[in-house]
Amino acid sequence: MIQEALAKQLLEETFARMNPGEAMEPGRKKYAELRVRRAERRVSCTGNLYQKAREALTEQETVLEEEPDSHLLLSTGSGLGRQNPAVVELEFDADSVTLTAWAKEGLIPQRTAQGAIKGMLELLGL
């Protein structure tokens, strides 16, 4: 599993790609100050879902890292209008998949990390 510091870095890089240009610099600085929230969910399945997940998720999400048959790390949009970046890690074994998501949130929690997991599970049909 990736560490929170790496998740924070990946979130900030994704936010910068989603909001390019000099005019967005104040927004990027403010985003960097937000807290990272984490959510995790383990789901039982029959057989290793890696290939199905890779095919279904990489059409819509950005692959940041992968290890065949066991690990995917994706960048996705979550929250209202998919405007808040989330980083989701999927770890596969013979009979389950564990999804761990990180997202930044302000004073009012929007449960963006949980929403990212829910979206991934829907794409996987779980």
Label the predicted regions.
Residues 1-126:
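Ser/Thr-rich, low-complexity intrinsically disordered terminal regions
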